[in-house]
């Protein structure tokens, strides 16, 4: 290769990233208009489009580089010089951390995820100690209650860029002040003030005002979800001021926010104070930088691995028929490998399973489906793998494993947040905890269905319980759109003998689902059955599911809240708003 080509390649990659992030910001900047126009289908499409942008631009850069190099292979020394030139371009670059991830993605695409070493990639950042210079435009604005909290909140709301009319601004402010007074007390509230992010955070059918409530005893989250009535008037649905509530809003089972962030690292640092339980990876994920979140997640995994002497083991729970799942006992992630052969009742291919996981990545997860990160050629040290797990890997996924002596390479896997399997949780809890879990499970099914997702396999083992007690679906191999399912009532038996026969007395076609059958395996436990019948008996009726299908086909997009219904102002303090 001619000398000097290394710099051209480095510049081409960085220019490609500039183009990608420019389009990312362009799509994001349309969130306000989509919200104001209540164009919820455009909201969903924009979310998918933004996710696709990254891989699209990586592909464009790869094609450019193949043209520049005439498709010739490049030796290790050449690639090292490219990385050195790229690193020199980054010290004054405002989004250096994501630019490093983009470089990694281009390299992996060029070399088919092979030779992934710290020398060739930004496994760790080239600027780990970098601090932010003066930000041209502050991320947030401070508001002090010099003339009382009603006046402060009126200024905050009047400062918003939204151009729609408010249904009842004074009422909403009254509700917020009442909530803050109940939370902090009058004296503490008088000594507190707000810091509010300049940009709204858009997701689904809400625009979120995100701020910090700075009190004498510490800083709390201050989150206001802004919704629209059917008449297109704005109202504030609740006020959230605990770290647990904020953590759920920014949770790993929700779609990414659309928030205009030219300096994403600065926004992540600003958010960290009100989301102390979130890792750097989770914060980048929440604002839509999912590919860099993958980089940060891998770094967190490496740091954990370096500091522990644990071995990977099979994950607790009932062994899956499609996925082999393993974990490190002290690490909050699971690693999922598609098996070489599935159980006989699973009539599907590995390609189908991967397509299901991609569907979940792009769809509105409504807080009920765990996000995943996909890896290729994932290297594990054999010394970190328990003998039992190694035997299981070779038995169930040998076609995806390459033995390198002291290491193995797994050709493809997913990493996902670890949860307590719901079936195990239900065995361990009683009383109100059991009731809450069954209520959560039913709510998860309803919210998934409202978002046009049918889980397929609804067994408790396919759901997990988060640290906040939320029930989340995580087994996607049978997932499909609600509109693809034919929900049927079981026809009455023709003769008494029909009910005793080993085969059904009615025809069953692909795509047929009989909700009455759910009762057999959801209500078998005598502790659970009565609770389920009390709270979710309608899930056993085909007409319930068909009514949901009709709403989806009519173009209706349901409201899904990142908080309990009882937290809504309309429920806590007043009559229903509409």
From Swiss-Prot:
Keyword Lipid biosynthesis: no
Biological processes per GO annotation: glucose metabolic process; glyoxylate cycle; tricarboxylic acid cycle
Catalytic residues as annotated in Swiss-Prot or TrEMBL: 371
Compartments where located: Cytoplasm
One GO cellular component, as annotated: cytoplasm
S-adenosyl-L-methionine keyword on record: no
Gene Ontology molecular function, alphabetical: [isocitrate dehydrogenase (NADP+)] kinase activity; AMP binding; ATP binding; phosphoprotein phosphatase activity; protein serine/threonine kinase activity
Keywords: ATP-binding, Cytoplasm, Glyoxylate bypass, Hydrolase, Kinase, Nucleotide-binding, Protein phosphatase, Serine/threonine-protein kinase, Transferase, Tricarboxylic acid cycle
Binding site for ATP: 315-321, 336
Source species, domain of life: Bacteria
Main subcellular localisation: cytoplasm
EC number(s) from the headed UniProt entry: 2.7.11.5, 3.1.3.-
NCBIfam families found in the cross-reference section: PRK02946.1
Known function: Bifunctional enzyme which can phosphorylate or dephosphorylate isocitrate dehydrogenase (IDH) on a specific serine residue. This is a regulatory mechanism which enables bacteria to bypass the Krebs cycle via the glyoxylate shunt in response to the source of carbon. When bacteria are grown on glucose, IDH is fully active and unphosphorylated, but when grown on acetate or ethanol, the activity of IDH declines drastically concomitant with its phosphorylation.
Protein name: Isocitrate dehydrogenase kinase/phosphatase
Species: Escherichia coli O17:K52:H18 (strain UMN026 / ExPEC)
Gene: aceK
């Amino acid at each position: 290769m001619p000398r000097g080509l290394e710099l051209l390649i480095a510049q081409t990659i960085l220019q490609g990233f500039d183009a990608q992030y420019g389009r990312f910001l362009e799509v994001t900047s349309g969130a306000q208009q989509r919200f104001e126009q209540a164009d919820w289908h455009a909201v969903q499409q924009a979310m998918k489009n933004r996710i696709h942008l990254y891989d699209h631009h990586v592909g464009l850069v790869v094609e450019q580089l193949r043209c520049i190099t005439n498709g010739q292979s490049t030796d290790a020394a050449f690639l090292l010089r490219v990385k050195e030139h790229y690193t020199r371009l980054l010290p004054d670059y405002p989004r250096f951390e994501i630019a490093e991830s983009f470089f990694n993605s281009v390299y992996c695409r060029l070399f088919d995820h092979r030779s992934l070493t710290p020398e060739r990639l930004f496994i760790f950042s080239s600027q780990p100690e970098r601090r932010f210079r003066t930000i041209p435009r502050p991320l947030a604005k401070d508001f002090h209650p010099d003339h009382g909290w009603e006046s402060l909140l009126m200024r905050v709301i009047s400062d918003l860029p939204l151009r729609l009319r408010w249904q009842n601004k004074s009422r909403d402010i009254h509700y917020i002040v009442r909530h803050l007074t109940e939370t902090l007390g009058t004296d503490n509230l008088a000594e507190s003030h707000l810091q509010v992010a300049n940009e709204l955070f858009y997701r689904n059918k809400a625009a979120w005002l995100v701020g910090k409530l700075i009190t004498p005893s510490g800083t709390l989250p201050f989150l206001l979800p802004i919704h629209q009535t059917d008449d297109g008037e704005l109202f504030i649905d609740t006020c959230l001021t605990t770290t647990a509530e904020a953590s759920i809003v920014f949770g790993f089972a929700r779609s990414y926010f659309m928030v205009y962030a030219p300096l994403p690292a600065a926004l992540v640092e600003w958010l960290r104070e009100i989301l102390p339980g979130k890792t750097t990876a989770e914060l980048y994920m929440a604002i839509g930088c999912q590919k860099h979140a993958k980089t940060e997640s891998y770094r967190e995994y490496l740091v954990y691995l370096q500091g522990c002497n644990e071995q990977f083991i099979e994950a607790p729970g009932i062994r899956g028929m499609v996925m082999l799942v393993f974990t490190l006992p002290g690490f909050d992630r699971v690693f999922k490998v598609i098996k070489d052969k599935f159980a006989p009742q699973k009539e599907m291919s590995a390609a189908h399973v991967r397509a299901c996981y991609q569907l979940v990545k792009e769809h509105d997860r409504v807080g009920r489906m765990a996000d995943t990160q996909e890896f290729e050629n994932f290297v594990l040290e054999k010394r970190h793998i328990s003998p039992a797990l190694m035997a299981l890997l070779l038995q169930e996924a040998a076609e995806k494993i390459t033995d390198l002596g002291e290491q193995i390479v797994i050709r493809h896997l997913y990493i996902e947040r670890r949860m307590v399997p719901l079936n195990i949780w239900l065995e361990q809890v009683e009383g109100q905890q059991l009731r809450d879990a069954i209520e959560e499970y039913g709510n998860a099914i309803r919210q998934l269905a409202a978002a046009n997702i049918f889980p397929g396999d609804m067994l408790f083992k396919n759901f997990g319980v988060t640290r906040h007690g939320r029930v989340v679906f995580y087994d996607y191999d049978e997932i499909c759109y609600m509109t693809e399912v034919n929900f049927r009532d079981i026809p009455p038996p023709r003769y008494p003998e029909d009910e005793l026969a080993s085969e059904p007395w009615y025809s069953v076609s692909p795509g047929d689902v009989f909700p009455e059958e759910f009762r057999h395996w959801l209500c078998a436990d005598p502790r659970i059955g009565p609770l389920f019948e009390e709270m979710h008996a309608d899930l056993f009726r085909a007409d319930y599911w068909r009514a949901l299908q009709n709403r989806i086909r009519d173009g209706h997009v349901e409201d899904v809240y990142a908080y309990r219904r009882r937290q809504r102002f309309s429920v806590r303090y007043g009559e229903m708003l509409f």
